[in-house]
Curated annotation (Swiss-Prot):
Function: Interacts with EP300 and acts as a repressor of MYOD-dependent transcription and muscle differentiation. Inhibits EP300 histone acetyltransferase activity. Acts as a repressor of TGFB/SMAD transcriptional responses. May act as a repressor of the TGFB/SMAD3-dependent signaling by selectively blocking formation of TGFB-induced SMAD3-SMAD4 complex.
Principal place of residence: nucleus
Gene Ontology CC: nucleoplasm
Organism encoding this protein: Bos taurus
Protein known as: EP300-interacting inhibitor of differentiation 2
Domain of life: Eukaryota
Annotated InterPro entries: EID
Residue numbers bearing the Omega-N-methylarginine modification: R75
Domain notes: The N-terminal portion of EID2 is required for nuclear localization.
Disulfide topology: none
Subunit note: Heterodimer with EID2B. Interacts with the C-terminus of EP300. Interacts with HDAC1 and HDAC2. Interacts with SMAD2, SMAD4 and with the MH2 domain of SMAD3.
Gene Ontology annotations of biological process type: cell differentiation; muscle organ development; negative regulation of DNA-templated transcription
Amino acid sequence: MSELPADQGVPPAGAANDNGDVRQAEVGGRRREPAPAQPVAARDRPMAAAVEGSMASPVEGPVPEAREGPMAASREGLGAAAREARMAEVARLLAEPAEEEGPEGRPRSRPGNGPGLAALPYLRLRHPLGVLGINYQQFLRHYLEHYPIAPGRIQELEGRRRRFVEACRAREAAFDAEYQRNPQRMDFDILTFSITLTASEIINPLIEELGCDKFISRE
């Protein structure tokens, strides 16, 4: 075997490390080409796929399905209970009588009797006591039976109302008759009454509020 030339020996390690372009020499003068460097992304791709697979595996399992099952069942149960409550309320309203007796004993018409509103029980007008589940006629009968003074009080109020209505009608008839006899006199009386009413209700309180009544003679 021939001896290797001195200039083709193996270079020192320091020189190879300092200059990256210098290729390492082999025996026989042949130079070895460096292996192609793999990209960083190609090296990291298998590791990233393994990490993603390990993270995605517990989520895709049967755990979410088992977790969503009780929640869906509870929501369905609440919806069914609400529907049953609404149906019970509608049935209770439909079971109520369509007519009620008024204070005079004659039936009281209700808007729910019409064909158009028969299917809408919530639009029927109800007595305030009906909201509390109290029948108005039974409540009134119980009140009249246990409080003997109530019938007398009611009759007294009815008498006062009747007398007031009769007096108003009599005054209206007298006013019409007087106007037919002397229209000019009635017009003057109406004007005088209007001025007097305005002075008593507006002008006099304003004078007292401003303090001008001290300078006005009260004679």
